[in-house]
Amino acid sequence: MAKETFYITTPIYYPSGNLHIGHAYTTTAGDVIARYKRMQGYDVRYLTGTDEHGQKIQEKAQKAGKSEIEYLDEMIAGIKDLWGKLEISNDDFIRTTEIRHKEVVQQIFERLLAQGDIYLGEYEGWYSVPDETYYTETQLVDPIMENGVIVGGKSPDSGHEVELVKEESYFFNLSKYTDRLLEFYDENPEFIQPPSRKNEMINNFIKPGLEDLAVSRTSFDWGIRVQSNPKHVVYVWIDALVNYISSLGYLSDDDSLFKKYWPADIHIMAKEIVRFHSIIWPILLMALDIPLPKKVFAHGWILMKDGKMSKSKGNVVDPNVLINRYGLDATRYYLMRELPFGSDGVFTPEGFVERTNYDLANDLGNLVNRTISMVNKYFDGELPAYQGPKHELDKDMEQMALDTVKTFHENMDDLQFSVALSTIWKFISRTNKYIDETSPWVLAKDEDQKEMLGNVMAHLVENIRIIAVLLRPFLTHAPKQIFSQLNINAPELFELESIEQYGALTEPIMVSGKPEPIFPRLDSEVEISYIKESMQPDKIEEEVEEELPSKAQIDIKDFDKVEIKAATIIDAEQVKKSDKLLKIQVDLDSEQRQIVSGIAKFYQPEDIIGKKVAVVTNLKPAKLMGRKSEGMILSAEKDGVLTLVSLPSAIPNGAIIK
């Protein structure tokens, strides 16, 4: 009987620079899902790859004095090397410069053109080269005005400058499919995850009216040519999104993989591109009469204390640095444990070192070390066979093991990786406590308690085996080391089925003579400093004091220029050497911003985290006490007391307040 299939994809990454830990986070999460599903018995196909066309690649190659493909080959080699270091278990790596992809894109474009879903027109709009995205005037951040007319601004996705572009372009008729898309959302409520993303797509993009999408360019030539009009190259989203089916052989002479694995079970990506995957991609598939994927999951951003981590800001963490110095398992564990999948998380060197020392070295490493040492000390290395529970502590422990396995599966099915790991670590903590409760060193002094002592050792080793099995999707080395040191060689004891019931070690086993540390402890001060040094940007901005614009009376026309959006405060801290300023990070959905606010005398930083506030987003950036401030949080003032203007939590981040 054929196995049930499971098809998972990451976004294809844009190789205009070295990938950072945010890319590693997405791809590791996909790998965790793939490994878990394989353990469940699924026939898994895991796809990742690179999006290699566009103006930015062309410019990067020219600047490097290379052809586009020479530049790309070097970049892709680095990406594949990183995926190798992370031991990503992808089954395919798609490059959009491959013939197998190009031919499919060209066929799809001509088909959509022939059936009237694509038409030729002229486009004028604000274009960001790094984002490869057009924006309307209302979407621009920090618009520049001259005589009441917008003459520039920044991308809402990245903050890069935009330029006004006017050129002949083919358009994809998105609006034609609006009703059908909304109907699909209603019939498939789990399609967009987390659920808040669905509300954002509907309220921020669909309800205001979908605009037809420019799908070709003539102002550069590094891309896939439109066969019927070769002066046009296919624009990014029809090119990039099609990789999910071109990699399976759709429209090729051999489409067996497409028939076997499509529709995809899940597309995972960072939240800034969820609208392309939940609006454009479904509509494109509808136009092609292809079944839609089962789920689109948008995870949050990895933030620094000073805002979003990105290549353009120069505040990135290189995953190679972490892997090379601390090992793969420590890196994978931190990413999946510290950062809740679906929400934003903050990377800190302190957090990385603490997780490695406390969770891995102390809790897990010491449990394995202590147990193997006791089996060697009290039984000359030969673990007695499991005989069943001997007292209430054993029964409680066995029940917790079964409950842990059940909860773990629930967490994994919900893609709550950090919660799944927390569940495992509660079991690790309980097992460590079991040692203290049973006091093997006391039992060993009484020959009449030899059987009871053996029973304790059997429970400890069985617990460790269960822990190692549960960790297999996350850690690629430690579970193997644990099995090796316990001298457990039967392959069936590595699998999920073996932990559905407690007590699989029914025969004596001889553990290793001397346990080897799985996770050595780190010198916290040294390693925190090392990570911080590796994160330093190439260029530090000089601290320059700038004042915010002075107050003035305005009329209604001027007020209309003010852009106010809903945002959630995600981090706050006191500005050093200032008794009135807080440095605050806010989530505006499409971006994170840093705002310096003079509310320190009225609020403690921890008191405002999680508050929904109103933010003026189109103020010119300023610096206060050397800290960049990118907006203003609205507050009310009475008798010298400031109170933040709070908004209902139901208002989505990024919603415009009028």
UniProtKB/Swiss-Prot annotation:
Name a biological process GO annotation.
Answer: methionyl-tRNA aminoacylation
Gene3D superfamilies registered for this protein in UniProt: 2.170.220.10, HUPs, Isoleucyl-tRNA Synthetase, Domain 1, Nucleic acid-binding proteins
Q: What class of enzyme is it?
A: ligase
Q: Which UniProt keywords apply?
A: Aminoacyl-tRNA synthetase, ATP-binding, Cytoplasm, Ligase, Nucleotide-binding, Protein biosynthesis, RNA-binding, tRNA-binding
State whether it acts alone or in a complex, and with which partners, per the record. Answer: Homodimer.
Q: What PANTHER family does its record include?
A: METHIONINE--TRNA LIGASE, MITOCHONDRIAL, METHIONYL-TRNA SYNTHETASE
Q: Where is this motif: 'KMSKS' region?
A: 308-312
Q: Which residues cross the membrane?
A: none
Places the protein is found: Cytoplasm
Descriptive protein name: Methionine--tRNA ligase
The reply to whether Transferase figures as a keyword in the UniProt entry is: no
UniProt binding sites for ATP = 311
Give all residue intervals belonging to the tRNA-binding domain.
Answer: 558-658
Gene Ontology CC terms, in alphabetical order: cytoplasm
Organism encoding this protein: Staphylococcus saprophyticus subsp. saprophyticus (strain ATCC 15305 / DSM 20229 / NCIMB 8711 / NCTC 7292 / S-41)
* Function in brief: Is required not only for elongation of protein synthesis but also for the initiation of all mRNA translation through initiator tRNA(fMet) aminoacylation.
Asked if the Swiss-Prot or TrEMBL record annotates the protein with the keyword Translocase, the reply is no
Catalytic activity as recorded in UniProt: tRNA(Met) + L-methionine + ATP = L-methionyl-tRNA(Met) + AMP + diphosphate
Q: Which Pfam families does the record match to this protein? A: Anticodon_3, tRNA-synt_1g, tRNA_bind
Q: Where is this motif: 'HIGH' region?
A: 13-23
Under which EC number(s) is this enzyme classified?
Answer: 6.1.1.10
Family designation: Belongs to the class-I aminoacyl-tRNA synthetase family. MetG type 2B subfamily.
Give the lineage: Bacteria, Bacillati, Bacillota, Bacilli, Bacillales
* Gene Ontology molecular function: any one: ATP binding
